[in-house]
């Protein structure tokens, strides 16, 4: 689903 780190 995005984020940092780029989670699913």
From Swiss-Prot:
Name of this chain's protein: Flavor peptide
Domain of life assignment: Eukaryota
Further details from the record: Contributes to umami taste and sweetness of the cooked fish.
């Amino acid at each position: 689903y995005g984020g940092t780190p780029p989670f699913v």
